[in-house]
Amino acid sequence: MVKRVHIFDWHKEHARKIEEFAGWEMPIWYSSIKEEHLAVRNAVGIFDVSHMGEIVFRGKDALKFLQYVTTNDISKPPAISGTYTLVLNERGAIKDETLVFNMGNNEYLMICDSDAFEKLYAWFTYLKRTIEQFTKLDLEIELKTYDIAMFAVQGPKARDLAKDLFGIDINEMWWFQARWVELDGIKMLLSRSGYTGENGFEVYIEDANPYHPDESKRGEPEKALHVWERILEEGKKYGIKPCGLGARDTLRLEAGYTLYGNETKELQLLSTDIDEVTPLQANLEFAIYWDKDFIGKDALLKQKERGVGRKLVHFKMIDKGIPREGYKVYANGEMIGEVTSGTLSPLLNVGIGIAFVKEEYAKPGIEIEVEIRGQRKKAVTVTPPFYDPKKYGLFRET
C-alpha cells in the first residue's frame, strides 16, 4: 500500500506533480524545481518531509543499545541535541544515515531515511528480542513515523521567520540543537538542521494522520495543517515557497550531500558485498567514533588495512551535458566508475554530480569524462559544495 503524509490532501490540491517516492506519494514540485530551488538559496522555502522515519528508544539501557548499533558517540551531546551517526550491518555497509536526538530522561529520537525506517525498526526489535546481550535490557523501541509530521524550513530568511513565529534566534543554537516551542498553542520540537546546505530549522509535530496504516489511529491532522499554513502565511513577506522533493534533491546535490540508495546502501540479501557501500568509501569517516565497539567495526578495520577500492568523488562538467545516475565515468581511456547522482545545477546552470570511482581518482582537480548519450564529455573532480560558500549556504558572508 502506498503511504501518505499527514497533509497529503493539501499537497494534492496545490502541487503540480505528485509521484511515488520510497513507497510514499509525495509532492515533487509546486511551481517548478528551479523556482523552488532558487527560493531556498536566496530566500526561504518549506518542505514537507513527514515521510522521514522516526524511532523512539526509551529506558535506562537506551543509550547502551544505541552506542552499539550506531557508529558515532551519542553520549556526549546534552539534551536536547542531536548527533549525525550511521547504522551499519556486520559487513560494515551502511544500513542508513541517521540523526539521533538525546531527548533527556533516558529517551532518544532517531530520524532515519524514508525507505529505511521499516527495516531499521525490524532489525532493532530483532536484536532486542534475540541477541543475548540485549534481551534483558531496560529498553522500549517504538516506531513513530506515522504519528509525527515533520516540516523543514530552509534558506537565508529562515532565521527571520523563526524569530517571527517562535521568538527565537536559531543562530544562537548549534547545528542539531533542538528545543520545545509553541505556535498558537501547538507544542512541537524545533531543531536547527536541514538537508539543503542552507541555514534553517525543522519542526516535529505529533498529530493524527488520516492515512495512518493503523485505522484506529486515523484522524484529521489539524495541528500539522495549521502549522504548515501558518508558516506559509508568515513567510509571505520573505518570499517563501512550498517546495517538493525535486528541489530537495537538487539542493542536497549542490551542497554535496549523500542520498541513501544512491551514495549509501546495503544489499538486502546476504550474498555479496559488490554493491554495498561503507563509510570509508562514502567519505563519512567523520561519523565514526573509533574508541567504542559497534556493529560493523571489525569489517571497517579490515577494509582500512586492505584499502577501500573505490570512493565517492564530486565532479563538475566542463563540456555541456547533464550527468545522471548510472552513467559511466572514464579517465585515461579506462572506465573508472559510474555516476551515483547527477543534475543540472539550477544555481550554476552547469552539470554536477557524485560518482564512485577507483580510489586513486577520488581527489579534486582530476579531469575525467562522463559518458552522456553515447558521447564522452569532459568534467573535473571538485571539493563540495559546488557553490561559492561565501555567497551561499550556511556559512555565507553576504
Curated annotation (Swiss-Prot):
Can you provide one Gene Ontology molecular function annotated for this UniProt record?
Answer: aminomethyltransferase activity
Record keywords, A-Z: Aminotransferase, Transferase
Q: What class of enzyme is it?
A: transferase
Which InterPro entries does the record associate with it?
A: GCS_T (IPR006223), GCS_T_bac (IPR022903), GCST_C (IPR013977), GCV_T_N (IPR006222), GcvT/YgfZ/DmdA (IPR028896), GcvT/YgfZ_C (IPR029043), TrmE/GcvT_dom1 (IPR027266)
Q: Is Transferase a UniProt keyword of this protein? A: yes
> A Gene Ontology CC term for this entry?
glycine cleavage complex
SUPFAM superfamilies attached to this UniProt entry: Aminomethyltransferase beta-barrel domain, Folate-binding domain
| Keyword Transferase applies | yes
Pfam families xrefs: GCV_T, GCV_T_C
**EC number(s) recorded for this UniProt protein:** 2.1.2.10
Q: What positions belong to coiled-coil segments? A: none
**What is an annotated GO biological process for this record, any one?**
glycine decarboxylation via glycine cleavage system
Enzymatic reactions:
N(6)-[(R)-S(8)-aminomethyldihydrolipoyl]-L-lysyl-[protein] + (6S)-5,6,7,8-tetrahydrofolate = N(6)-[(R)-dihydrolipoyl]-L-lysyl-[protein] + (6R)-5,10-methylene-5,6,7,8-tetrahydrofolate + NH4(+)
The family database entries (NCBIfam families) matched by this protein are listed as:
gcvT, PRK00389.1
Q: What does this protein do?
A: The glycine cleavage system catalyzes the degradation of glycine.
Quaternary structure annotation from Swiss-Prot or TrEMBL? The glycine cleavage system is composed of four proteins: P, T, L and H.
Q: What PANTHER family does UniProt report for this protein, alphabetically?
A: AMINOMETHYLTRANSFERASE, AMINOMETHYLTRANSFERASE, MITOCHONDRIAL
Q: Which family does it belong to?
A: Belongs to the GcvT family.
Name of the protein in question = Probable aminomethyltransferase
This chain's source organism reads Pyrococcus horikoshii (strain ATCC 700860 / DSM 12428 / JCM 9974 / NBRC 100139 / OT-3)
